[in-house]
């Protein structure tokens, strides 16, 4: 009797523990699944233990046919973007090359005049004020300014050094004729004294300047006489 009682007690306990598992309900699971999956997904609730695995397989089977649309097209688009950027760079390079080949002299002069372009971009008022005396003189004496234009095209550094000498700019405002004479004599000064400060000191010597204006030949002989005396 005691043995039968224990068997009945065990059966009742197993039955009680078996009833705590809920029955499979298809309605809430199917409502959570995406609408583009196949209808076979609704039949995955056969066993509560197999539910997660079956749902995972069903979702993978539903996404796999759609992968060319959702995965391959964005990756192909991302691969095409660098090609589009490279194509745009090639088009700009070809346009610049055509511009350079069409007018090589203007392109080289534009690069040699880069310091003046930077000054014009940073301070346009100072750039215009600096160029005003030379523009007036160039309009008055175009043939005499031709060597300076050639110097600017050949050696922009030397041209810029000439333009930065303020006494010449002041002299250009006061007396254009004297300024042109000074500019024609400037290569001899630069050959005799490479230092710009020494050149300015030589230019400030009034007797030599007056002699250069009246008699340039005698002025050229003055450094030789001075070198022989000292």
From Swiss-Prot:
The keyword Transcription regulation does not apply. Residues 1-18 form the signal peptide. It comes from the Eukaryota. GO terms for molecular function: nutrient reservoir activity. Keywords: Repeat, Seed storage protein, Signal, Storage protein. The alpha zeins of 19 kDa and 22 kDa account for 70% of the total zein fraction. They are encoded by a large multigene family. This is Zein-alpha 19A2. It comes from Zea mays (Maize). The lineage of its organism: Eukaryota, Viridiplantae, Streptophyta, Embryophyta, Tracheophyta.
């Amino acid at each position: 009797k005691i043995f039968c009682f224990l068997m009945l007690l065990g059966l009742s306990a197993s039955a009680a523990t078996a009833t705590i598992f809920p029955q499979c309900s298809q309605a809430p699971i199917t409502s959570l699944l995406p609408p583009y999956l196949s209808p076979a997904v609704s039949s995955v609730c056969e066993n509560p233990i197999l539910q997660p695995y079956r749902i995972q397989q069903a979702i993978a089977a539903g996404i796999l046919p759609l992968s060319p649309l959702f995965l391959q097209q964005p990756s192909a688009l991302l691969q095409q973007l660098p090609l589009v950027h490279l194509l745009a760079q090639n088009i700009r390079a070809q346009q610049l090359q055509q511009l350079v080949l069409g007018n090589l002299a203007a392109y080289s002069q534009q690069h040699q005049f880069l310091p003046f372009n930077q000054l014009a971009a940073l301070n346009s008022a100072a750039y215009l004020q600096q160029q005003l005396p030379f523009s007036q003189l160039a309009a008055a004496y175009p043939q005499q300014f031709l060597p300076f234009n050639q110097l600017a095209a050949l050696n922009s550094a030397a041209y810029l050094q000439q333009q930065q000498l303020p006494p010449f700019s002041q002299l250009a405002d006061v007396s254009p004729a004297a300024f042109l004479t000074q500019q024609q004599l400037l290569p001899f000064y630069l050959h005799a004294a490479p230092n710009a400060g020494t050149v300015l000191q030589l230019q400030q010597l009034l007797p030599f300047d007056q002699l250069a204006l009246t008699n340039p030949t005698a002025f050229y002989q003055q450094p030789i006489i001075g070198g022989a005396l000292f």
